[in-house]
Amino acid sequence: DAEKFPLKMADLVVTSVNPYEAPDSVVWCSDPRNVIKELPTVGLPGDYFYSPMQLQGEWSKYTETICSVDPSGRGSDETAAAYLSQKNGFIYLHEMRAYRDGYTDNTLLNILRGCQKYGVTKLVIETNFGDGIVAELFKKHLQNTKQAIDIEEVRANVRKEDRIIDAL
């Protein structure tokens, strides 16, 4: 099973994330003292979440902050938004949101409020369903809310699990 699921919980460092800045380095360590016992283990047996051993260096602004949007497809699929920043090769996940009402105005405006909260400069929108319609809807709301956010459309052509691993 370990080969089938190459992304492990232990590969992630779990800590509170500042919305605007981060340290120069986050030091990972698999010391049992760093296991976060309060978080449920949802992976393979023996796989745990760990807190950082140290946060090192100066704190400064993130290099980039994006919002990645995966619009709902068919059936019970949800629209998902992930707010991510990066600095010095580290990716910081601020928040993830999921919406059951597709890409309604309320959903898109809520996603844009999150963009404002975290200082997002780019929306990355998956175009597999709708052929770009979601990006057009976002453009309308960006204009109405006077937010200066670039939009990048991407087409996913591999399994969702593989895309997540590649992004990390």
Give the location of each predicted region.
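Generic structural signal for beta-strand residues in well-ordered domains
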Residues: E58-W59, R74, Q116, N144
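ATPase catalytic-site recognition across NTP-hydrolyzing enzymes
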Residues: D1-V69
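Mg2+-dependent endonuclease catalytic cores in nucleic-acid-processing enzymes, primarily RNase H-like
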Residues: A82-L168
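Gly/Thr-rich phosphate-binding beta-strand-loop-beta motif of the actin/hexokinase/Hsp70
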Residues: W59-Q86
